[in-house]
């Protein structure tokens, strides 16, 4: 499992940057503050990833289905599904099995709040 920035994913960084640029109307920045706040949550090794900001709002989710981590399929998380719990429910309803997988979060304000919810199997990266 990994927690990293979008640009550190081999083969997927450009795809993700283009996608997020479209989401923000063509605006993509690389400031130090944004690198800290844009977190990549790994829901499982190499297959499902969710991009969220520092407040826990899920912005984008996609599936990487090959060993090179190319993002060959994705599931856009609409505004009404921009909370992490709802995104997990959305991915599960799409047929992605998350029952045996651990959600890895960096210890931010968002992860502390989410970890307090019942029903989540969380391992903090410290």
Protein language model annotation of sequence segments:
Residues 55-63, 70:
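Glycine-rich phosphate/pyrophosphate-binding loop shared by adenosine-nucleotide-utilizing enzymes
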Residues 26-54:
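Active-site rim helix/loop that mediates acceptor-substrate recognition in acyltransferases
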Residues 1-34:
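Short amphipathic alpha-helix that is part of the acyltransferase structural core
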Residues 97-126:
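Conserved active-site alpha-helix within GNAT-family acetyltransferase domains
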Residues 68-79:
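Conserved acetyl-CoA binding element of GNAT-fold acetyltransferases
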Residues 41-45, 66, 96-99:
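Flexible, charged surface loops at secondary-structure boundaries
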Residues 77-97:
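Conserved acetyl-CoA-binding loop-helix of GNAT-fold acetyltransferases
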